[in-house]
Swiss-Prot record:
Residues at the catalytic site: 180
Protein purpose: Catalyzes the reversible oxidation of malate to oxaloacetate.
UniProt lineage: Bacteria, Bacillati, Bacillota, Bacilli, Bacillales
Pfam families from the UniProt entry: Ldh_1_C, Ldh_1_N
GO molecular function per UniProt: L-lactate dehydrogenase activity; L-malate dehydrogenase (NAD+) activity
Species name: Bacillus licheniformis (strain ATCC 14580 / DSM 13 / JCM 2505 / CCUG 7422 / NBRC 12200 / NCIMB 9375 / NCTC 10341 / NRRL NRS-1264 / Gibson 46)
Keywords, alphabetical: NAD, Oxidoreductase, Phosphoprotein, Tricarboxylic acid cycle
Name of the protein this chain belongs to: Malate dehydrogenase
Amino acid sequence: MGKKRNKVSVIGAGFTGATTAFLTAQKELADVVLVDIPQLENPTKGKALDMLEASPVQGFDANITGTANYEDTAGSDIVVITAGIARKPGMSRDDLVATNEKIMRSVTKEVVKYSPDCIIIVLTNPVDAMTYAVYKESGFPKERVIGQSGILDTARFRTFVAQELNLSVKDITGFVLGGHGDDMVPLVRYSYAGGIPLETLLPKDRIDAIVERTRKGGGEIVNLLGNGSAYYAPAASLTEMVEAILKDQRRVLPTIAYLEGEYGYEGIYLGVPTIIGGNGLEQIIELELTETEKSQLDKSVESVKNVMKVLS
């Protein structure tokens, strides 16, 4: 018997889902199944075939399948959920939440049916609330249902700091806590350039400007694109989580995790520092927060709770 190959299913074959599928295959992390609704089955198959045909050129060995049939996802190690609608002009946030919650619940039923032992990573917005909806629908332990936003938010923060200091992004570390929105909390005290505290390298007004730009990072790209939202960086962030799990790397990554008293919050999904490894969420890391940071995080939690009130 040959060794079982890793299998990752990506639900939603839009820009983010397709890019995640391609990056996962390109890194030879797993065979990939890209899933979308029956009306989009042919375009989904087309994208998967196009990626597969890149493999001889890029030199990677991974099977990539496009489908509208969840049976093809059976036995997945990880399922990444990017499916959902984007907010349209004139659409209320509550409408968006209600619609995407329905999608999350129907997708999760299929995921649980065919991959009862998988780890689920959620990207669909509003991501904190959608991760909670998937957790409730799945019946999985909290370790196996996590959301992605903090890696992306932190990547934006690191990018802007690197640009400001004219340094390699590899040398910039940082952490963004809280919900994925305008109330996220970039922790400047825990941010470094080559091990040197950021606060010793940049004046407060420049740091404040970077923090503000990070909070508005998604909107900045939406405005520039004019149609659609970011997908390269979100897909790269998802792929980093997939790799950490499949290789059991025990990476310290900001992740949307279910809190049971950590940071003083109960029964809510929120972006916090975590250890991510072979079991999914291995551990939540509790940092000491200043009064200001804690009050900012409280505000972020209120924003998440307001969205969660709309959930059925």
